[in-house]
Amino acid sequence: MSQTGHDMWAEARNLMVDDQLRPSEISNPGILKAMRALPREECVQPAQRAAAYADVSLPLAPGRVLAQPLLTARLAQAANPLPGEHALVVGAATGYSAGVLARLGLVVSALECDEQLAAMGQAFCKANALAVQWSVGPLNTGLPANGPYDLIYFDGCVGAVPDFCQKQLKPGGRLVGLIQKTGDIPEIFRATLTATQEGARYAFAYLSKAQSPLLPGLCPQPQFSL
């Protein structure tokens, strides 16, 4: 008896979790459950679906990718997400990471600058993760209307922490994403906003090296010297 399409994708999701995530110290049961359930193949073009669960990133638009499954899981686990928290996903693309956070019980605002990617993401979340509210606009200003947030999640790489984060993050809130200092390999980071006598500051933790393109508008500014 041949497999149905539903069975085929369900098996692919289970293999992804069991062969890629669990051996790589992804232990949060909510993340594993969400990624066993969410149809990642709906976040890419039909011609890419056969590779949707492979250990690779997949191009979505110039300079934009659907992150490899393990990177998404590592970022979500680094975020220490809690049900009921409010999260902003910056560079939400076609909605997969936003969907994972929503399946973990977070109330998610998804911000995307590319209208076509956002349309795919909205359709994906409407079918699979209703607790996601979408907005289209520049990434470098955040989304103050829905803040402040417990978590700001960059679904990609930044050159530095954007200025908007301190105003839109709650005290004790977290930033998660990849950061690439000039000339360095990107690193997964978590930054917690803490209060000090000198004012609010971030406490940084750098977790592991990874690869992801710089998000539009969040690249480091070029430095010129005479």
How would you describe each model-predicted region?
Residues 80-206:
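Conserved nucleotide-cofactor-binding alpha/beta core module
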Residues 226:
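Catalytic, metal-anchored helix/loop core of enzyme active sites in primary metabolism
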